[in-house]
Amino acid sequence: MKTIKILIIIMIFAIIQMPVFDARAGISVAPDRHIVSLSPGEEMLVKYQVSNVGAKDVNITIAPEAWSGLKDPYDWLALQSDNVYVKAGESSPIVIGVSAPEDAIGEMVAMLFLCYKDTSESQLNIRNGVPLYMIIKGTEDYGLDIDNIEVTYTKNDNNVNDLNIIVDINNTGNVHIVPDVKVFIRNNNGKLLKEASLNRPNIVLRGKKHTYRLGWRNPFFKDGIYTVTAVLDYEDKIESVSKEAQFNVSDNNIEMIPSAKAGN
């Protein structure tokens, strides 16, 4: 079975990502996130580049906040400056020193909020965030469970049944993950009827849950029992996670089969 792949690229000072762009003020930020890996007590610098592609100068205040109730970011990061003035058509760096606390475990996550005013007549206050992840080397715990699989029918605009698959996952580890979620549907003879990926990759923070959904428009199922298998892949640290569920199709209705009956 494919082993788990987390979709992150760790570099010493930066990772290459598409920039964040806010058309309201003509601001873009690159990269759209940083993911760094440090040993306890280790320090480094990270840099974001803010570009003003608008027609007016912008004054930006940087305000880091803990994300998902994790350690206070001011315990492990220091801004070179909490304010940056960017002239129209120019760019400016945001430099941040990060230091892994000696007692840190798993991962620290901060959201760096860029606060400024809309340069249009509305003068609205704008607050955009870019994340900073710091993984603590040697303390990572990768864990993931599939809590539930559910299959239902819903009527579409043509009054025909569409199939809906819901997979609820739970990050039981202490670092964020970006799982690749796939589902496989087989008939009672084991023939593969459908293979599909669920949504685009989503970041699931430690201790958090996420629901993935798949819609299959106007499938045809004969009456009978079917098996749906969900498979989650991420970094090569643990084996893939999978779970099966069965459902019964009868007279254009779907009923989930309890796991004890399904033999799971």
Residue ranges and their predicted role:
Residues 23-53, 83, 144-162:
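Beta-sheet-dominated interaction scaffolds and their linkers
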Residues 30-32, 40-47, 92-94, 105-112, ...:
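Short, solvent-exposed loop/turn segments enriched in Ser/Thr/Gly
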